[in-house]
């Protein structure tokens, strides 16, 4: 750790400099004696939204992430339904920048940056590759059957045997 001045432009870190080397600013915050750290990235979250709002909603989960210093998260599929095809992904978990009711809800509900994993199980292998063009960053596959009574949460997400896995 070292002492430094931090320049912010448009809400983002723009420059880290030796103390006293930054130009005059509109606003100055004295953070002397404090640590300034980059935001954390949580690469594995399941918000269960939609489908199990009683467990955690997108809005509540992202606020908790921000409170803990996390500025980016990667959402993994286990919602109802999980994002195993482009239609579900675009309807439920659409990437930033697209216009839709789902995107508005997620954009307005999140106070941190986010991206999504897609489901890549053995039930719908034809949907895996096209999903990559919709904006997901990676795939998730469970190598077991859906737990009893939870088939809807795991649709398109499991490859419980080698036949499914190697298709």
What residue ranges belong to the model's regions?
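Histidine-rich, glycine-flanked metal-binding segment
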Residues: 1-38
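Short, low-complexity, polar/charged sequence segments that are solvent-exposed and flexible
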Residues: 8-13, 48, 59-62, 92-94, ...
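Receiver (REC) domain switch-region micro-motif
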Residues: 28, 41, 139
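Metal-associated gating/positioning segment near the N- to mid-region
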Residues: 31-109
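Histidine/acidic-residue-rich, glycine-tolerant segments that coordinate divalent metal ions
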Residues: 79-87, 95-167
């Amino acid at each position: 750790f070292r002492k430094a001045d931090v320049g912010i432009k448009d809400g983002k870190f723009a420059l880290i400099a030796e103390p006293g080397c930054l130009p005059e600013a509109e606003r100055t915050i004295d953070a002397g004696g404090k640590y300034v750290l980059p935001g954390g990235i949580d690469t594995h979250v399941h918000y269960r939204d939609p489908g199990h709002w009683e467990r955690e909603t997108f809005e509540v989960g992202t606020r908790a992430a921000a409170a803990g210093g996390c500025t980016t998260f990667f959402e993994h599929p286990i919602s109802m339904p999980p994002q195993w095809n482009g239609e579900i992904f675009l309807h439920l978990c659409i990437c930033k920048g697209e216009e839709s009711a789902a995107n508005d809800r997620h954009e307005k509900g999140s106070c941190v940056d986010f991206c999504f994993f897609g489901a890549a199980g053995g039930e719908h292998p034809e949907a895996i590759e096209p999903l990559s063009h919709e904006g997901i960053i990676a795939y998730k596959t469970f190598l077991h059957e859906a737990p009893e009574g939870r088939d809807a949460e795991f649709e398109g997400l499991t490859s419980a045997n080698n036949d499914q896995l190697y298709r």
